[in-house]
A protein has these predicted regions:
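Membrane-embedded segments
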Residues: 55, 61, 65-151
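Alpha-helical transmembrane signal-anchor/signal-peptide segments
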Residues: 22-44
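C-terminal regions of proteins
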Residues: 256-257, 261-334
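Hydrophobic membrane-insertion alpha-helices, especially the h-region
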Residues: 2-23
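Active-site segments of SGNH/GDSL-like serine hydrolases
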Residues: 236-261
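Well-ordered, non-membrane alpha-helical segments in soluble/globular domains
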Residues: 96, 224-232, 262-273
């Protein structure tokens, strides 16, 4: 029995030592120097290290609807060093956590771009804290030492093996060193028939015949949007010198036409919070009935636009930022 116990303890210690050496989430204060990069598929584990990286001075925060905003292009347009911290299906709670973590390590951040989409506009009575992907809250607090308590598990071991493969040149990073990944670049995946299947559930287009009114308006005051209650938390605590863009990213018109009043109400509420807390912020509303949102080939599915559209969004961010600097206020780009 003693031999068995000793063997188990020894094996466990070796496994834990391997995990600590590989530092799969780049979260340890002390670990051997290696050419690490994000390897965990779950961005909630991969991105805290990027949020702490002092090589950046600006960030994109949101869900997958702003994941295609490319840091390298934003850097050129805005004269900054961007990291994209947008995560698939990120709840507003997670977005607030990510923003606070970034600001802990970047108290003089130059730019913050927030994507406001269905994650904020959901009709709900309660707040979602996390998704089925799980949320390692210990990675988002100010104490990195406590991360060591949560690393002895099969997922950390799996990602340590991936990190070893990466260091040995046997694996590519899951995400770029600036958090970017283009998930829309497969030509086969962009065949129009497939795109329309993902948008409409059919191979033929079913565009709304009449224009869809998506202007911000107080049209559903009785609707409970619990997530929107956290929007003030997102904006609070951001340094006065940080330039903020609140972006309503463009989704396909078919998706928006299913419940336009909800989007109108959500945008009205978000705009009210921005005007109260950060009137210096830019509000860029692309969640509109437009040539962009009516063109099927601009989309990967009903929610996600492709890289060519992302580039147009980035240019719009740069234009509105410059207009705001010159004394503008609320800007819409159609």
């Amino acid at each position: 029995m003693k031999i068995l116990v000793l063997s188990l303890v020894t094996s466990g210690s070796l496994v834990y030592a391997f995990i600590l050496v590989m530092d799969p989430y780049q979260s340890e204060l002390v670990s051997p120097s290696m050419p690490r990069a994000p390897v965990a598929q779950n961005q909630r584990y991969s991105y805290p290290a990027l949020a702490r990286n002092v090589g950046f001075d600006s960030a994109v925060v949101g869900t997958s609807t702003v994941r295609l905003l490319k840091p390298a292009r934003l850097n050129t347009l805005l004269g900054a060093r961007f990291v994209n911290l947008a995560m698939n299906d990120a709840t507003p709670f997670e977005q607030v956590l990510m923003t606070r973590l970034f600001l802990q390590h970047h108290p003089r951040a130059k730019f913050l771009i927030f994507g406001v989409d269905d994650s904020w506009c959901r009709e709900s009575e309660s707040v979602r804290v996390e998704t089925i992907r799980g949320l390692p809250e210990f990675m988002y607090d100010a104490n990195q030492w406590n991360d060591l308590l949560y690393l002895f598990n099969d997922k950390a071991l799996e990602n340590s093996v991936r990190m070893l493969e990466l260091v040995r040149g046997k694996r590519e990073p899951k995400y770029g060193l600036d958090g970017y990944e283009d998930f829309s670049d497969d030509p086969e995946d962009r065949r129009l028939s497939l795109v329309r299947e993902r948008i409409y559930g059919a191979s033929a287009a079913v565009l709304p015949a009449s224009p869809v009114n998506l202007e911000p308006a107080r049209v559903r005051p009785g609707v409970r949007m619990a997530e929107m209650d956290q929007f003030a938390d997102l904006l609070s605590g951001i340094p006065a010198g940080t330039r903020i863009t609140v972006l309503f990213p463009p989704r396909h018109i078919w998706a928006m036409s299913q419940n336009p009043g909800l989007y109108q109400e959500c945008k009205w509420r978000a705009r009210s919070v921005v005007k109260t807390l950060r009137p210096d912020a830019v509000i860029l509303d692309l969640l509109l009935d437009s040539a962009i949102t009516r063109e099927d080939s601009n989309y990967h599915d009903r929610i996600h636009y492709v890289d060519e559209v992302a580039e147009k969004v980035e240019l719009a961010i740069a234009r509105t930022t410059e207009k705001k600097r010159r004394g503008g206020s609320y800007w819409e780009v159609r």
